[in-house]
Amino acid sequence: MSSDLEAGSLISIKKNVKDIMIPSEEMKLEVYPMDYEEFCDATGNNYGLLQQIYDSGAAIGQATNRKLMRDLRIYMAVGGMPQAVEAYVNGKNFSEIDMVKRQIISLYEEDFKKIDASGRMSALYHAIPAHLAKDARKYRITTAIGKRNNTKAEELLYELIDSKTVLPCYNSTNPRVNLTDTKDFDSYKLYLSDTGLFVTLMFIDRPVTENDIYAKLLSDKLPANLGYLYENLVAQMITVSGRELYYHTWDKKGSTHYYEVDFLISEGSKINAFEVKSSGSGKHESIREFCNKFSQNISKAYLISQKDAGKEENLLLEPFYLLPFLIK
């Protein structure tokens, strides 16, 4: 096998390599993960039902909503990488599926080291879950690599973004105008292009992620606040729709805290705002303040959570599994 095929990301695709092979398993590695519709088709779930639910515009009841959220959490746990999906369809347990995902991450790291043998590019990739877990206003290169920021580190970041293994989300400094025109290149967050790989990277400090952890994830009983995991899911879904990722953050008057709206997308001359909550409970202070501040510029404001569809004043409540239909 030619050595230039032994790669895992678009770093190799840029050299016109289309079929990437995992040397040990002889598995083709497709860079782009399956979206949720493709995953449902591959696993025998009825994606068309979600379209019907969306078209109805009505709540579906707690039992059905719980079932559909569990189905979506399976997608989050497995991810959309074809090898992981194949392992799931073939009845592998989640620890075995996790090992497949670790192989894919290892291939990415091999690609990263072809560009940067020091390991800094891999460190930038590995730091993404921790950055999001801290709920920081932006991704900091210096936190990831432990060194002073410099031009070389920024070049590695752009190489990482070009590899399509990560998704950049830029702060829009003024959502009143075109999001692209107000993109702050120095203020951004990073997500992974596949949420299944994100789950594995969250627990990469252990040799394998145990079935028990996956069982708790599927039943929504992990002890940690997993809002950042659901943010990654939303980032992936928005990207699949062909849109760039934007968010907006601004200081809270008279406080050291700040407001933040997780995602913004353009709709005609206006914008739709999205706040992501793993639970759906809470005051939703940021998006309400955003609606007050930018009332003339907003088309719709959504709270995306695990709860059934509904409405709170001018805030539309929607479950995660309906997001693809909201952003078409």
Question: What name fits each language-model region?
Answer:
Residues 12-28, 40-46:
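Short regulatory helix/loop adjacent to the ATP-binding pocket of P-loop NTPases
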Residues 41-230, 256:
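Interdomain hinge/linker elements that couple catalytic modules in large macromolecular machines
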Residues 9-14, 33-38, 173, 197-198, ...:
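Conserved nucleotide-binding/hydrolysis micro-motifs of P-loop NTPases
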Residues 27, 49-54, 321-326:
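A polyampholytic, Gly/Pro-enriched intrinsically disordered region
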Residues 14-17, 41, 87, 202, ...:
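Short glycine-/acidic-enriched loop or helix-start segments at secondary-structure transitions
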Residues 3, 155, 161-165, 169-328:
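A cross-kingdom feature that marks ATP-driven nucleic-acid transaction machinery
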Residues 26-30, 301-303:
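Conserved beta-strand scaffold positions in the cores of enzyme catalytic domains, especially
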Residues 3-9, 30:
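Structural recognition of the conserved hydrophobic beta-strand(s) that form the central parallel beta-sheet
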